[in-house]
């Protein structure tokens, strides 16, 4: 049986990366919430 999680950095960044977040109003709200919470990393693409 094939496992469901088949990692790909490209797909990960396209869906959850910084530019993907900035592209929509709701994505920007996500970033704002994470900034307010004090997250060290805002998105998966940020080191």
From Swiss-Prot:
Annotated gene: rpmH
List the residue ranges of the region (Disordered): 28-47
| Recorded family membership | Belongs to the bacterial ribosomal protein bL34 family.
What name is this protein filed under? Large ribosomal subunit protein bL34
Compositionally biased intervals (Basic residues): 31-40
Gene3D superfamilies linked to this entry: 1.10.287.3980
Question: Which superkingdom?
Answer: Bacteria
Q: Which GO terms describe its cellular component?
A: ribonucleoprotein complex; ribosome
Q: Name one GO biological process term.
A: translation
One GO MF annotation is: structural constituent of ribosome
| Disulphide linkage map | none
Q: InterPro entries, alphabetically?
A: Ribosomal_bL34, Ribosomal_bL34_CS
Keywords, ordered alphabetically:
Ribonucleoprotein, Ribosomal protein
Q: Which organism is it from?
A: Proteus mirabilis (strain HI4320)
């Amino acid at each position: 049986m094939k496992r469901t999680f088949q990692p790909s950095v490209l797909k990960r960044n396209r869906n959850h990366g910084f530019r993907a977040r900035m592209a929509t109003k709701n994505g920007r709200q996500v970033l704002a919430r994470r900034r307010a919470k004090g997250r060290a990393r805002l998105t998966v693409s940020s080191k």
